[in-house]
Amino acid sequence: MQEENIRESIEVDVLIIGAGPAGLATAIKLKTEANKNNQEINIVVLEKGSEIGAHILSGAVIDPIGLDMLLPNWKELDPPDMSEVIDDRFYILGPAGSLRIPNFFFPRLMSNHNCFATSLSNVVKWLGNIAQSLGIEVYPGFPASEIIYQEDRVVGVITGDFGISKEGEKKDSFMQGMEIRAKYTVFAEGARGHLTKTVIEKFKLDKESDFQKYGIGLKELWEVPEENHKPGLVQHTMGWPLDNKTGGGSFMYHFGKNLVSVGFVVHLNYKNPSLSPFEEFQRYKTHPIIKDMLSGGKRLSYGARVIREGGYQSVPKLTFPG
């Protein structure tokens, strides 16, 4: 109780947990609308990563309609390098061969033409700079650890303590987390945020939704020889190396200066206990149509993250008290 009495506390109008594309877009939209109406609004965005974009792994194909609505002049705001999609391919893979599915078989919503291939991490960093230029306070390195409730309403969060040893002891550099109270709190933590889960459970936001389903996505960023690079190529596959009882697929996006984002997704309802998504990803890269594009290149970075796959019917109610 004594620690709670000395805990630093600040109050804001809107608190957003997570400085990903959703969290930053929310902050920018709120701020620009407030500015249009000559209203003052204090917005704080907390990000657990050490810097904006640190936890964003996906190579991305971005439909510019979202940017057009959020920032109509976005092309004049020095956006990150983007390659317009000019070649959109889908293959079914076998152990040695492949079958390309003609584009006319796919519904319009699956077409990537007029979209842009880019690094989502760089897009998020760019959005972060725009948010800060608008006067939005963005705090990287500040994870939200606990939700504050008052009369069954969310009124803010408590940030994590700093200066804790691996044994759980307070070090000389210990700094207690602070309370950030807000009129409105937005949780934009990603696919399986730990605070989001507690909010969903407390307010039973998923009682009318189907069960959520998840996959694991593994991604690498490669720099390839210029002769292997096809700017604007977006390629997706399904099939090998996964068997017909295991769901998943792959993506490959060519963008920037000889950069290729390659990823592999495995649905987490697979039955084979010996299956390793990592090993399947490595096997996938030995397929001729993948190997030929990566040959002579070097891997620059890699990572993995959970992906929501339940679809629209699994989306919980998105509003709650607070």
List the model feature ranges, each with a label.
Residues 1-17, 21, 135-142:
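Glycine/serine-rich loop-strand microenvironments at binding/catalytic pocket rims
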Residues 12-44:
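N-terminal Rossmann-like FAD-binding beta1-loop-alpha1 element of flavoenzymes
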Residues 14, 42-50, 182-186:
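Extended hydrophobic secondary-structure segments that form protein cores and membrane-embedded regions
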Residues 22, 51, 192:
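Conserved Rossmann-like nucleotide-cofactor binding loop
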Residues 39, 121, 126, 130-290:
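Predominantly flavin-linked oxidoreductase catalytic cores and closely associated redox partners
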Residues 40, 48-97:
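N-terminal FAD cofactor-binding segment of flavoenzymes
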Residues 99-120, 129, 156, 265-266:
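Helix-loop-beta segment of a Rossmann-like dinucleotide-binding subdomain
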Residues 246, 272-322:
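FAD/FMN-dependent oxidoreductases across multiple families
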